[in-house]
């Protein structure tokens, strides 16, 4: 069975490193070198189907290495077909990797989620006479506009309270975080969902400040802290494999052969885009769908071929791993 390489991340090192049997499937974790950087990998069957429950092993491996090294973390489940595939990644992305390693050197990520306690609304009702009056009137009438006005007043009061809390929270954290990224908020109870970039030496001070905040807002806010983590949200590099069927369908949509250049892809796309643009076919209900398919096909192939040899033959596509800028 062919042996692939499971990729965890990239570190700065001038010689091969071994980290023990801490990888997926208890595999040995080591580095594959290119000049002054190394890919942290473990051997794995090339057609191995990584199980979702092994994501925890992936995370633990990164955290273990992070104890003594700065590592650019890679997403879960990336398998290169062979060692040369990994070496090619390092060659193509060396300067991006080095710049990112410098940016996150000796730093870690801490995720903080802060939610309202369910008593906060009651506090606002008690403190705001105008809302109390509107609430009492709304209970006595079916007047919809009054209820809408009440809802707006409550939202405004909540927003004001949120701004007060956020100002205080950021003031107490001070300059301990070097950077922060806002994560998606999926419910109304969440006040803040953020990732903070913190110097390793200041980790405990950051935790102490969070404890100070938790104590201060004990019956008002709930704090959830996850970390320390590798700085996923503060690296601009993303590595992905491209699915052959996706690439092949895109090739066929544009009517291309298996060996193409980026200039050929551009030329064919421009011709097809002009020919099938929806503005030129106002009476065709499928024109927009056709144009979208052409545009999507171009984006797939442009991503694949921009910096690499453009062979769309099956084995070449399956061997290729893309190095891309993350989309914030």
Q: Which residues are covered by each model-predicted region?
A:
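Short, surface-exposed helix-loop/turn micro-motifs enriched in polar/charged residues
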Residues: 186, 283-286
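An interfacial alpha-helical scaffold signature
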Residues: 1-222, 228-229, 235-242, 247, ...
């Amino acid at each position: 069975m062919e042996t692939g390489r499971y990729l965890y991340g990239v570190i700065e090192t001038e010689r091969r490193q071994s980290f023990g049997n801490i990888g997926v499937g208890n595999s040995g974790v080591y580095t594959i070198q290119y000049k002054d950087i190394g890919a942290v990998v473990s051997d794995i069957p090339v057609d191995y189907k990584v199980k979702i429950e092994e994501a925890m092993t992936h995370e633990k491996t990164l955290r273990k290495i992070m104890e003594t090294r700065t590592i650019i973390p890679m997403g879960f489940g990336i398998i290169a077909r062979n060692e040369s595939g990994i070496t090619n990644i390092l060659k193509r992305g060396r300067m991006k990797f080095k710049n990112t390693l410098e940016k996150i050197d000796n730093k870690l990520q801490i995720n903080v989620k802060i939610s309202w306690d369910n008593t906060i609304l009651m506090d606002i009702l008690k403190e705001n006479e105008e809302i109390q009056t509107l609430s009492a009137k709304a209970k006595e009438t079916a007047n919809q506009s009054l209820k809408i006005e009440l809802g707006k007043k409550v939202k405004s009061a909540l927003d004001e309270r949120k701004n007060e809390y956020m100002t205080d929270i950021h003031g107490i954290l001070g300059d301990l975080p070097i950077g922060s990224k806002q994560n998606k908020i999926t419910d109304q109870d969440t006040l803040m969902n953020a990732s903070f970039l913190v110097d390793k030496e200041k980790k405990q001070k950051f935790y102490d400040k969070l404890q100070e905040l938790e104590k201060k807002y004990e019956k008002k806010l709930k704090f959830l802290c996850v970390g320390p983590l590798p700085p996923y949200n503060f690296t601009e590099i993303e590595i992905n494999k491209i699915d052959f069927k996706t690439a092949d369908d895109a090739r066929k949509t544009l009517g291309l052969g298996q060996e193409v250049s980026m200039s050929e892809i551009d030329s064919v796309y421009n011709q097809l885009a002009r020919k099938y643009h929806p503005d030129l076919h106002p009476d065709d209900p499928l024109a927009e769908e056709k144009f979208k398919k052409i545009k999507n096909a171009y984006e797939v192939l442009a991503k694949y071929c921009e910096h690499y040899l453009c062979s769309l033959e099956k084995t070449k596509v399956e061997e290729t791993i893309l190095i891309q800028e993350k989309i914030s």
